[in-house]
Every structure is written in C-alpha cells, then in structure tokens.
C-alpha cells in the first residue's frame, strides 16, 4: 500500500521531481507558508505553491470580500462577498490539492504585529502582498531579526514588484544553465591516467576503434600534443584547430585511403573546447572559502558553512588545489563496456573524494562538540557533486534600503542613464507610498480624483527624490500613468507575478536554484523586467 502511495505521488509530481528531486519535494512538503492578504496577487502565489504540494499554508487577512475582490480574484466568487477574505480564499485554494493543509487567521497584520509579533516567526517563509509601507517595514524588521525569509509582492496597475528580504541564503544545488563538465583532462588523477594508458588506438580492431569514448580519444591525442609542444595545452583558436587536425588524422582509412565513418572521432573533434577547459576553483568558491563564517566555525555555525570549511581543507590537502571530482560524464558514442568502465573511474574517484571531505566534516563536528550525524551523508554527497556551483545570497534589510544614509543611490542613479529604465517604476512606487501616508489613500482611486492627484503625486515624487539626494529626472508621463492606475490590481499582472513569486518561494524552501538579490520590477507596459540590489 505504501509502495502504491509512493508511485501515485511520483506520477502526480513527475515534472517537478525531475527539477528538484525527492529531497527538494520533501522540503516543500514540510514547509509552512504564510500569506498576508488574500488579494489577487496573493492567491495566485498560493495557487502556484499549493499545486506542487507545499505542506501547509496560513492566510492572514482581516478584510471582508468586496465586489471588487470578486471581480479581480479568480479564487473569490460573488457568493463570497461579505465573508472573511482569508477564509473564502482558503476554501477554494484547498480544492486544488488534497495533500495540502490550509488555515486562516481573521485578523489584520497590523493587529498581529501590535499584539503578537512572534506569531510570524513560526513559518518557513512569509509572503506579504499589497501592504502599506509602514506595515512592510515593521514586518520586515521582526522577520529579519528572527531570520525568517520574507517576500514582499505588489501589483500596482501594470507594474509588478517583488522584494526578497533574507539575511543569508546558502545554495548547494544552484543548477547553473551552462555548467562545464568536470573531466580533468588537463590534470588527470592517477586512476584516470592509468585508464587512458590501457588504450592503444594504433593496434585496435576497427569495431573497438570506432567505439572508444571521445574522452579517451582526446586524452590520447593530448598526450601526443604535449610531447610535441613541451607540455603546453592548446589555448588559442589556432592551437585548438591544429589539435582538431591531429585528432582527424587518427581516423581509420579504408583500402582506398578514404577516411572511415567514425562518429566517435567526430564527437571528439566537436568536444575539444569542452574537454580543454582548465580545472580551477571558481572565484565565487574562493570567496566562500575566505568568508568569516567559513574561517570561524563555532557550535552555532550552520551545516552549510561546516561543509564549506571541510571542502576548503580537502582542497588544501587531498585535493592538491582542486575541488572533489564531480563523478559524472556526458553521454557519448561508445560501446556499453567501455563507457561503463570510464564512468566507474570517475565515480570511484568521486566517492573517494567525498569520503575525504567527510573525514574533515567529522573532525570539525568533533572540535565544536557536535554529533557526527548532525550532517548526513546525503548532504555531504550533494555538496561534493555541486562543489563548483555553491552560492551564498545576502540581501540588504528593508530598513537599510529605506534609510537616508544607507539607500543604494549608486544603483538607482546608474540605472537612470536610461530615463525609461524599470528603476523609474520603483521610484514611482515609493512616491505613491508617500502619497498614501499623507492622504490616507492612493492617487486616482476615484475617477474624479485623477486630475487633481497628478500635482499631489508629482509633489510627493519631488519630495522623495530631494529627501534622499537623488538627482534624477522622472518624466511626467509616469506620474500621469500612476494616477490613472488608481492602485488597481489587474488579474493579468497579478497572475504573472504570482508565478514568478512562487518560483522564488520554492527556491528558498528547497535551497535549490538561485534567488534574485533583492528587488524585481516587472513592467506590463513594455513587458520587460529587471532586478536591482537596493
């Protein structure tokens, strides 16, 4: 029965399991996400978290469903009008996935912050939508000190805005788009060198010759190249072309002197650039090794930094300046026997390296009085197979972004080289928040107010720019446009933002892929987006 349940789950979540694996799905299923405000944006975010199977969610919203809510929110109906918005949205969202547990709190976030701020610290991630500036700042401060990730999302007319607030977010499985293969042909380890030496391309049967893996072919001709060039690896375009010609000359000839059709040699020629990548430690990994948290290990140090320190010690000792072997090779034309033998050489070396890193982990844990099992073998293997792709994202706090002395002026001013850059939309959002603080409403919320609010909003924008010492010009067109928006939350923009925001939440929960740092702006007018470190 348990086996059947597992099979059904694999079928249900097949696509996403291929993306983040069983361990990523487990993290998702044990997560508890808090959504503040069941707005169109908020429910779209939750929809995209409920469908892939987050463990549970709680909606906090003290508002009642209005006619406007029923009109722009897919998860609220006319029959919901007058009910609590959190409760109504929860009921519809739970219908999407029976594996997910939902709950609601019929209270405003402001009241909870006044009476029980620690309430927000029980969640894996908090997602806040359509909050006023003052509430966002208070919430961000509470969660920052408790190291709970916060994602602020907002749909304002044709503008989408997201801000991630998280002190530190280490990522082991960053899944880079164009990861280079780890073949070590420039620095073959002894077992690999011995495997290459077992091949004699000059005295092979035709069948064996045409089914030799291209990695072996390149290694054999690289040895010949070294003997002719005093051990210098091909680097320039001309040298690589000469090296390709050298491989091409090794293709067998038929009785008429014409080259045979040997696809494995063609594959080798095609993969010269891939094979000749130098084995080195990326600068981003060097930065992690030199980080204070990697150098100063204590009992409170998170497992990521203990693993990073163990990796650093491996590089200095057993690795002889290199990271652990990844242990994977690409598919290629070869007979099964030869491919598996080559694959096993890399795999066995990867296991040996992982064991060496594991020994360093055990010593570090012992030195700080932690139990050896506090870091699992699964975590260790993940680190070693992804050691070249580790990332640490550190966001600035919202208080720093809003501080007169700590605002990132350089990022804003440099982006304003283009007067239509998406950063303008950020400045306008700050201006409408100032307008809201002064007027108790957003500009243009009623048709008759649009014209009279243009001057007021322009004044708010000017005041904001002057107060923060931002010597930039914003076109009047943007002021007019934001007044016409009337703080509306169009479902099309909310749906787009909901998908993008849910993706970031999943990255945070699974600790896979890399979150943006720290602000994302989407323009529905130009259908473009940009990220900024504010």
From Swiss-Prot:
Ubiquitinated by TRIP12, leading to its degradation by the proteasome. The gene is NAE1. Belongs to the ubiquitin-activating E1 family. ULA1 subfamily. Pathway: Protein modification; protein neddylation. CDD domains: APPBP1_RUB. Changing residue 49 to F: In NEDFIH; uncertain significance. It is linked to Neurodevelopmental disorder with dysmorphic facies and ischiopubic hypoplasia: An autosomal recessive disorder characterized by moderate to severe global developmental delay, facial dysmorphism, and ischiopubic synchondrosis hypoplasia. Affected individuals show infection-triggered lymphopenia, and loss of developmental milestones associated with epileptic spasms. Diminished white matter volume, enlarged ventricles, and thin corpus callosum are visible on brain imaging. Keywords: Acetylation, Apoptosis, Cell cycle, Cell membrane, Disease variant, Intellectual disability, Membrane, Ubl conjugation, Ubl conjugation pathway. Residues 331-344 are annotated as: Interaction with UBA3. The modification N6-acetyllysine is found at residues 6, 341. Binding of TP53BP2 to the regulatory subunit NAE1 decreases neddylation activity. GO terms for biological process: mitotic DNA replication checkpoint signaling; neuron apoptotic process; protein neddylation; regulation of apoptotic process; regulation of neuron apoptotic process; regulation of postsynapse assembly; signal transduction. NAE1 and UBA3 correspond to the N-terminal and the C-terminal part of yeast UBA3. In yeast the two subunits form a single polypeptide chain. Heterodimer of UBA3 and NAE1. The complex binds NEDD8 and UBE2M. Binds APP and TP53BP2. Pfam families: ThiF (PF00899). The modification N-acetylalanine is found at residue 2. InterPro entries: APP-BP1 (IPR030667), ThiF/MoeB/HesA (IPR045886), ThiF_NAD_FAD-bd (IPR000594), Ubiquitin-activating_enz (IPR035985). GO terms for cellular component: cytoplasm; cytosol; glutamatergic synapse; plasma membrane; protein-containing complex. This is NEDD8-activating enzyme E1 regulatory subunit.
């Amino acid at each position: 029965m348990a086996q059947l349940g597992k099979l059904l789950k694999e079928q249900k979540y097949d696509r996403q399991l291929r993306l983040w694996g069983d361990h990523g799905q487990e993290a998702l299923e044990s997560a508890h996400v808090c959504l503040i405000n069941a707005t169109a944006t908020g429910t779209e975010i939750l929809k995209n978290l409920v469908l892939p199977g987050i463990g549970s969610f709680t909606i906090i919203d003290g508002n009642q469903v209005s006619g406007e809510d029923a009109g722009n929110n897919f998860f609220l109906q006319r029959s919901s009008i007058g009910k609590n918005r959190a409760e109504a949205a929860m009921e519809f969202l739970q219908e999407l996935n029976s594996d997910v547990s939902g709950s609601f709190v019929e209270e405003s976030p402001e009241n909870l912050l006044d009476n029980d701020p620690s309430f927000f610290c029980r969640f894996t991630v908090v997602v806040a939508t359509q909050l006023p500036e003052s509430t966002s700042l208070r919430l961000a401060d509470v969660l920052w000190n408790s190291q709970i990730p916060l994602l602020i999302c907002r749909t304002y007319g044709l503008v989408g805005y997201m801000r991630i607030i998280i002190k530190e977010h280490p990522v082991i499985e960053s899944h880079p788009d164009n990861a280079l293969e780890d073949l070590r042909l420039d620095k073959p380890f002894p077992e690999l060198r011995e495997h290459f030496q077992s091949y004699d391309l000059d005295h092979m049967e035709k069948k064996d010759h045409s089914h030799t893996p291209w990695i072996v072919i390149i290694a054999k001709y690289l040895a010949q190249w070294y003997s002719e060039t005093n051990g210098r690896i091909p680097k320039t375009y001309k040298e690589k072309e000469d090296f390709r010609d050298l491989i091409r000359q090794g293709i067998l000839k038929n009785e008429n002197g014409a080259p045979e059709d040997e696809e494995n040699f063609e594959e080798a020629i095609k993969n010269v650039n891939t094979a000749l990548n130098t084995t080195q430690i990326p600068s981003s990994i060097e930065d992690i090794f030199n980080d204070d948290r990697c150098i100063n290990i204590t009992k409170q140090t998170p497992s990521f930094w203990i693993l990073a320190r163990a990796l650093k010690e491996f590089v200095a000792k057993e690795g002889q300046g290199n990271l652990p072997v990844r242990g994977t090779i690409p598919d290629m034309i070869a007979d099964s026997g030869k491919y598996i033998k080559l694959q096993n050489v890399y795999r066995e070396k990867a296991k040996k390296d992982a064991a060496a890193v594991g020994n360093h982990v055990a010593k570090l844990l012992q030195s700080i009085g932690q139990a050896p099992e506090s870091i699992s073998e699964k975590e260790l293997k993940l680190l070693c197979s992804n050691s070249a792709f580790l990332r640490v994202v550190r966001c600035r706090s919202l208080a720093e972004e809003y501080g007169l002395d700590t605002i990132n002026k350089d990022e804003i001013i440099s982006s304003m080289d283009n007067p239509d850059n998406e950063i303008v939309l950020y400045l306008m959002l700050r201006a409408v928040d100032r307008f809201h603080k002064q007027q108790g409403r957003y500009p243009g919320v009623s048709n008759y107010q649009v014209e009279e609010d243009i001057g007021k909003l322009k004044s708010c924008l000017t005041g904001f720019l002057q107060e923060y010492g931002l010597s930039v010009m914003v076109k009047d067109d943007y002021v007019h446009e934001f007044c016409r928006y009337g703080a509306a939350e169009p479902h099309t923009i909310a749906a787009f933002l909901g998908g993008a925001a849910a993706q970031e939440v999943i990255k945070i929960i699974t600790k896979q892929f890399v979150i943006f740092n720290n602000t994302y702006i989407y323009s529905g007018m130009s259908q473009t987006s940009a990220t900024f470190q504010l």
